[in-house]
Amino acid sequence: MGIPLMTTQGIIAVASAHLASLAGHTFNVLTVTKPVSRDAAVNLSRIISKLSPLLGNLIEFNTVEFLNSKDEFEGFGLWRRQDPGFPDTVFIGKVEPTPGFEIKAWFPLATEITARFKDSQNHFINDNTYVAMLAWLPEHLIYGKPCILDVCVASGKSVAEARDNHYHNPPDYLVLEPEDTKARTRNLQQTNTNGLKF
């Protein structure tokens, strides 16, 4: 699977293939026990998606370790998690522009929005950041360990453009880019788009 010259796109391609191989993988980081009754199962089914933010972070940690265990990256750099920061995971090494992944854990049965993606198109000018969406469910639908159902990796640039093209519909709905806040400390910089509906 090695490629002769590691470039930004080459590293993203190799990492994307490894991420795709996570489909069917069960993360041994948390176990939700089997409900003791039918009522307990109904109640659990209503709240199980609340685990998505926690599992999203655990998946991010595990993804960095998983990618760093792959031989193809040896000698070129290491994957690092950025928290807080954008994107979630970056490849620190000899390759420019820096490759990265914004990792989204998506719970398909959620009763609220999961895997939100509001990042500005400004982040994707070099097309070096990709979005990795990992769809997960507990291995027994509402209980068990988190299991990755499937993985989708796409250019962050194409996702942001498609989102903005879909929603931006003046004068009814406007997608607004964030203000220039580079002079602020990192934790106060605005990076997300906003929607304005009239």
Please place each PLM-identified region on the residue numbering.
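Structured, beta-strand-rich domain cores
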Residues: 86-90
